[in-house]
Amino acid sequence: MSCSKDYLNLMHIYLDGDITREDESKLSRHLEDCESCQKHFHELNRTITLMRSAERVEAPDGFTENVMANLPSEKKTVKYRRWFKLHPMWTAAAIFLVLMAGGMISTWTHSSDQLVVSAQNELIVDGDTVIVPAGVTVPGDVLVKNGDLLLLGTVDGDVTIFNGKILDNDSEMNGEGLMASVGGVNGELETIDRMFEWIWYNIKNFFKGVFSF
């Protein structure tokens, strides 16, 4: 088609429905005299008519769900990595707790049976027994590991026993989780003879020290 592009533009304007009466008359006169433009115009008109008459194709019911269900599932390792990237603080805290627990388990399993006592001068050590003498008040918390504690006096604080028991004059005291103001202890009595209790005790004391600053 060797005619001016102006007529081609007029064809598009006509098909869009925006042509003026003057331009429409001008295009009509040209199409009557130009067979090539007339053929091109009919092809454009037919194409648009076919496109408008074509039915809209819709996907069958459940098509999207079926496609999503057939997609390969995401590996769990990828999910975990994404979660770790989105929660760096929780990840660091979890790693710290795992390492801390591992170190405490190692300490528990490889520790010797040697008696360990907190450093109050008022305490007396007799073999595997730590004695709070009668009439004596021991200030602060008392810790005894791999031994027993005989209470004849008073402890002005908490008492914690690892791998041992708390004694009074005549019998063993059940100190687990007990709060006492009678029997020589003005604080919390706690006996620890299992690994997980040991881990929890250290974690609790660690965070208690952190939040005390």
Swiss-Prot record:
One of its GO terms (molecular function) is metal ion binding. Its cofactor is Zn(2+). Its main location: membrane. The keyword Transmembrane applies. Zn(2+) binds at H30, C34, C37. It is found in: Membrane. Gene3D superfamilies: Anti-sigma factor, zinc-finger domain. Is processed by three successive proteolytic events. First, the extracellular region of RsiW is cleaved by PrsW (Site-1 cleavage) in response to cell envelope stresses. Next, it undergoes cleavage at an intramembrane site (Site-2 cleavage) mediated by RasP. This cleavage uncovers a cryptic proteolytic tag with conserved alanine residues in the transmembrane segment, that is recognized mainly by the ClpXP protease, which completely degrades the protein in the cytoplasm and leads to the induction of the sigma-W-controlled genes. It is a single-pass membrane protein. Pfam families: zf-HC2 (PF13490). The chain crosses the membrane at residues 88-108. Keywords: Membrane, Metal-binding, Transmembrane, Transmembrane helix, Zinc. Residues 109-213 are extracellular. Residues 1-87 are cytoplasmic. Is the anti-sigma factor for SigW. The presence of RsiW leads to the inactivation of SigW, and its proteolytic destruction to sigma-W activation. Belongs to the zinc-associated anti-sigma factor (ZAS) superfamily. Anti-sigma-W factor family. This is Anti-sigma-W factor RsiW. It comes from Oceanobacillus iheyensis (strain DSM 14371 / CIP 107618 / JCM 11309 / KCTC 3954 / HTE831).
